[in-house]
Amino acid sequence: MLAESFCRKKELKRMSALASTGLLLIRLVVGLTFAGHGAQKLFGWFGGYGPKGTGGWLESIGIRPGVTMAILAGLAELIGGLLFAAGLLTEVGAALIIVVMLVAIAKVHAKHGYWVSSNGIEYPFVLIVVALGVALTGAGDYSLDALWR
């Protein structure tokens, strides 16, 4: 009985490490991708158009004032992405990601249906579910949030 309990604890510890590694991978890829998109909007990095270029496009789809909204979206993506990636205030980072994706769905993708092949909501919807899933699960042991548990 004691050996069985020890084995069970060891297996649970291994499963926790694997789950935390999986959450770390998800957070890093999704969070840093969002941070990169924020840097595109704010600074024109990584092939982005900066606030003016992004603002012009936002105005063309009815989001005004374009430059201000580009800066706000860029800040939400940059800050939200970095928080999410680091696992620091993960729920706040996830909320910023979710808000940006909800706006993208409402203003760009909803009229095109579901599938990404027709510019539909598929991809932003998946990102919303990933962010929500991590927020509900927690950032895992390999996160800055874990330091405060």
Where are these regions (language model features)?
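Extended, low-polarity transmembrane helix blocks
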Residues: 2-48, 53, 59-60, 64-75, ...
